[in-house]
Amino acid sequence: MKGTLILSNKLNIQIVTDKSKWDKRYLALAKEISTWSKDPSSQIGAVAIGSKGEVLAQGYNGFPRGIKDLQDRYNDKDRKYELVVHAEMNVIYNATYNGVCLNGATLYVYGLPVCSDCAKGVIQVGIKKVVMLKQDVPLKWEKSWQKTKEMFNEAGIKWDFCSES
């Protein structure tokens, strides 16, 4: 069956013909994770999914472990940018913290496309595909997004946009 994804386990076999259905589900999970961010201006979420559909790690934009999520730090943009860890990097850090390998995983990102700094991390840990919410890229992130696309293409990382509905 060309174009059909078969997911199996010991109990049953499930034939999935609409891969985008799973992309939308995992993107919805990334959206839920984005709500965990305490940043009042940007809520980004990401989740890494393994080859069998298992959740490997998740992350949202926020401060590192042990750094207090004080509202005045979020309100001061310069201070916030010094402290904040992007959702994509939090996925990588959380996986590392828990001893989980992301090699071959798919990363789902809700909120903004992957920036060029996070793209470096995605490439380095062996993530093979990135799916992001279909949207217009904000002007201030356009240059970074262009660099991300160049790096992903050169490194052989598949990337795509997916709508929510």
Question: Where in this protein do the model-derived segments appear?
Answer:
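Zinc-dependent deaminase catalytic domain
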Residues: 1-165
